[in-house]
Amino acid sequence: MRVKEIRKNWQHLRGGILLLGMLMICSAAKEKTWVTIYYGVPVWREATTTLFCASDAKAYDTEVHNVWATHACVPTDPNPQEVVLGNVTENFNMWKNNMVDQMHEDIISLWDESLKPCVKLTPLCVTLNCTNLNITKNTTNPTSSSWGMMEKGEIKNCSFYITTSIRNKVKKEYALFNRLDVVPIENTNNTKYRLISCNTSVITQACPKVSFQPIPIHYCVPAGFAMLKCNNKTFNGSGPCTNVSTVQCTHGIRPVVSTQLLLNGSLAEEDIVIRSENFTDNAKTIIVQLNESVVINCTRPNNNTRRRLSIGPGRAFYARRNIIGDIRQAHCNISRAKWNNTLQQIVIKLREKFRNKTIAFNQSSGGDPEIVMHSFNCGGEFFYCNTAQLFNSTWNVTGGTNGTEGNDIITLQCRIKQIINMWQKVGKAMYAPPITGQIRCSSNITGLLLTRDGGNSTETETEIFRPGGGDMRDNWRSELYKYKVVRIEPIGVAPTRAKRRTVQREKRAVGIGAVFLGFLGAAGSTMGAASVTLTVQARLLLSGIVQQQNNLLRAIEAQQHMLQLTVWGIKQLQARVLALERYLRDQQLMGIWGCSGKLICTTSVPWNVSWSNKSVDDIWNNMTWMEWEREIDNYTDYIYDLLEKSQTQQEKNEKELLELDKWASLWNWFDITNWLWYIRLFIMIVGGLIGLRIVFAVLSIVNRVRQGYSPLSFQTLLPASRGPDRPEGTEEEGGERDRDRSGPLVNGFLALFWVDLRNLCLFLYHLLRNLLLIVTRIVELLGRRGWEALKYWWNLLQYWSQELKNSAVSLLNATAIAVAEGTDRVIKIVQRACRAIRNIPTRIRQGLERALL
């Protein structure tokens, strides 16, 4: 019968086994993955940070103070490392690059700092009596030419009155000024002038030893950041770049301050490259980068001499005294063939943006001298050159050109200004002291700044381009177009099949994530409650440290004029703090997750497919770290929070397990150290009871002696007297005995302990009650005595105040009487003296009468 039942149920049993096997196979196929932390992954994000400088300052003259303060920069790396990032495409945008703004602010600060200790020329804002300097052509010099002669009135010989080293004394002095540096005063006959910027700016004279020679500056990123460089040879400045490398510093950038023409910059590696934020917007500047430089040689033939004028105590003004030799105009020379070839290549590139158009170059449409002319610094003097000959040509579609032809050399007439409107900000001007001797300099034109005339491009077939400039950001942008700063994110999370071995305990109802207190919010909590917020406190403590460092840096920046710190010094401090902040933040996160000192750290947090449903093999075999970070970017903070909760729960579990391990084995109860502790506790209890018995025995003896009894045995039961009306009887007598006054005779440890404890409580009660009564009595007595003393002192005060009043009245009366009596006596004496004087003639007459008689 049993065999038949087994055969009957075999079909159901076989189906159940098959279903169980399928479930096991499905569960095995759907393997679980866990979050794994990786430290040092190649991941970055766009960021802005403080850059610091590196320079080969030692390779230049150390006696001359360079305005760029490159002596405060760190030395350049002799072997710079550049790592090419293969299979990486990164977006660059030269028009929205924080590096450009940062360099612009740095150059402004460096100019301001270099002029801080220099002399203010406010005393020179006086009336100048000027005449034209006589210009005579030296015919014996064969090199002189008509074009080179300076125009009449280009140099003014001005006399003026200035304060000497003694403030209340004034003397007359003279100096030579350029026509561009002075303006005539209204309603005069062109003989009275003033300095050009006196009505709008504060003029500061550049210190005599300040040099404006551009020294290459390398911008570097602090630790924790990287600089990406685009190596595409035809990169237009914005958009994706496929040839990317990472560097720590830029190439050497010369901070050349110039307009219209870019000097001594970097060249394009292949064809000429033109860059603009928007070619269809004529308000946007077009930056042209040449692939071959054009040499420009500039000369100031005049041999100037200068003199030192005292304009007050401790202040000196350096003026031009005289011009020796030919007074010829400063000029620059450019090869016409090279310049035309350069323009032809520029036209080819412009036609790619403006198809079927005639390209015309024309001179500047007007504005400040810095914009209208090509301004730059040559040997310490600021040249302003007329570039009309450079930009005066038309290039038609067929390739022909209509321009000014001439000899092989293009000569640009230049003027020199000594009072320069500072390009950094309005309201500041600088006076460049004259340079003695002749000046020559040679520069390389590596780029142009162009602007396009407006208008509807469909109505005209000609696009007119003019030289531009003035915004020095375009100068820096022409060098920094290939760089961008990124923040390295070395911590990455990804799913793996490995799980961290953990201590398994039942989860509590309240999670750690529900407790978010401030850094000091748990100060009043219990130790157990405060330990829950240790992670939050660690994070807030780090942000507090960083905030403190930032506050210190702001304080240093506010006092840099007292500490004599340059801009580069501030940036180096900031770079070091940023590096420390980055390192501490990463190490803090790794420590919070229990991964300190590890590069690969497994966790017990399961991977959720909602974060990314890609398989582990697909992730690790087909994706880069940058692609993976973009995939899970929205869930990174949530994963970090889960890792923190998991590690906190793990630490709690380990703590509770360690607490249970102390009682895991009963054998620990019989450990010799525990027994010694038990014995010590027993001895302390017994000793305390014995001491208590001794104290009560002494107190009982003292109490009995005070009552007239002899100190008998502590436990002997003594009968009490019956009183005078009840005589003692015998044991055989009947009747009830009176109660005894002594305590009962007890046996045993617990009974003795109870009696002693009861007696102690009664003793303390009576003692405290008596003490309270005594204190109450003392307070009452002191209150009564105090009130009586107060009344006594009050009566005494009233008595003595009345006595003092009476004494004062008596004293005043006596004084008045004495004064009155004294006054009467004085009056009588005066009267007697007057009578005596009045009676003198009478006495004389009487004496004469007696003598005659």
Curated annotation (Swiss-Prot):
<keyword id="KW-0732">Signal</keyword>
<feature type="disulfide bond">
    <location>
        <begin position="595"/>
        <end position="601"/>
    </location>
</feature>
<feature type="disulfide bond">
    <location>
        <begin position="53"/>
        <end position="73"/>
    </location>
</feature>
<feature type="glycosylation site" description="N-linked (GlcNAc...) asparagine; by host">
    <location>
        <position position="362"/>
    </location>
</feature>
<keyword id="KW-0053">Apoptosis</keyword>
<dbReference type="GO" id="GO:0055036">
    <property type="term" value="C:virion membrane"/>
</dbReference>
<keyword id="KW-0014">AIDS</keyword>
<feature type="glycosylation site" description="N-linked (GlcNAc...) asparagine; by host">
    <location>
        <position position="134"/>
    </location>
</feature>
<keyword id="KW-1168">Fusion of virus membrane with host membrane</keyword>
<feature type="site" description="Cleavage; by host furin">
    <location>
        <begin position="508"/>
        <end position="509"/>
    </location>
</feature>
<feature type="topological domain" description="Cytoplasmic">
    <location>
        <begin position="703"/>
        <end position="853"/>
    </location>
</feature>
<protein>
    <recommendedName>
        <fullName>Envelope glycoprotein gp160</fullName>
    </recommendedName>
</protein>
<feature type="glycosylation site" description="N-linked (GlcNAc...) asparagine; by host">
    <location>
        <position position="87"/>
    </location>
</feature>
<feature type="region of interest" description="CD4-binding loop">
    <location>
        <begin position="364"/>
        <end position="374"/>
    </location>
</feature>
<feature type="disulfide bond">
    <location>
        <begin position="220"/>
        <end position="249"/>
    </location>
</feature>
<feature type="disulfide bond">
    <location>
        <begin position="298"/>
        <end position="332"/>
    </location>
</feature>
<keyword id="KW-0325">Glycoprotein</keyword>
<feature type="glycosylation site" description="N-linked (GlcNAc...) asparagine; by host">
    <location>
        <position position="634"/>
    </location>
</feature>
<feature type="disulfide bond">
    <location>
        <begin position="130"/>
        <end position="158"/>
    </location>
</feature>
<feature type="glycosylation site" description="N-linked (GlcNAc...) asparagine; by host">
    <location>
        <position position="129"/>
    </location>
</feature>
<keyword id="KW-0812">Transmembrane</keyword>
<dbReference type="InterPro" id="IPR036377">
    <property type="entry name" value="Gp120_core_sf"/>
</dbReference>
<feature type="disulfide bond">
    <location>
        <begin position="230"/>
        <end position="241"/>
    </location>
</feature>
<feature type="disulfide bond">
    <location>
        <begin position="118"/>
        <end position="207"/>
    </location>
</feature>
<feature type="glycosylation site" description="N-linked (GlcNAc...) asparagine; by host">
    <location>
        <position position="189"/>
    </location>
</feature>
<comment type="similarity">
    <text>Belongs to the HIV-1 env protein family.</text>
</comment>
<feature type="glycosylation site" description="N-linked (GlcNAc...) asparagine; by host">
    <location>
        <position position="264"/>
    </location>
</feature>
<keyword id="KW-1039">Host endosome</keyword>
<keyword id="KW-1165">Clathrin-mediated endocytosis of virus by host</keyword>
<feature type="glycosylation site" description="N-linked (GlcNAc...) asparagine; by host">
    <location>
        <position position="199"/>
    </location>
</feature>
<keyword id="KW-0946">Virion</keyword>
<feature type="region of interest" description="Immunosuppression">
    <location>
        <begin position="571"/>
        <end position="589"/>
    </location>
</feature>
<feature type="lipid moiety-binding region" description="S-palmitoyl cysteine; by host">
    <location>
        <position position="761"/>
    </location>
</feature>
<feature type="glycosylation site" description="N-linked (GlcNAc...) asparagine; by host">
    <location>
        <position position="456"/>
    </location>
</feature>
<dbReference type="GO" id="GO:1903911">
    <property type="term" value="P:positive regulation of receptor clustering"/>
</dbReference>
<feature type="glycosylation site" description="N-linked (GlcNAc...) asparagine; by host">
    <location>
        <position position="608"/>
    </location>
</feature>
<dbReference type="InterPro" id="IPR037527">
    <property type="entry name" value="Gp160"/>
</dbReference>
<feature type="transmembrane region" description="Helical">
    <location>
        <begin position="682"/>
        <end position="702"/>
    </location>
</feature>
<dbReference type="GO" id="GO:0016020">
    <property type="term" value="C:membrane"/>
</dbReference>
<feature type="disulfide bond">
    <location>
        <begin position="125"/>
        <end position="198"/>
    </location>
</feature>
<feature type="glycosylation site" description="N-linked (GlcNAc...) asparagine; by host">
    <location>
        <position position="444"/>
    </location>
</feature>
<keyword id="KW-0472">Membrane</keyword>
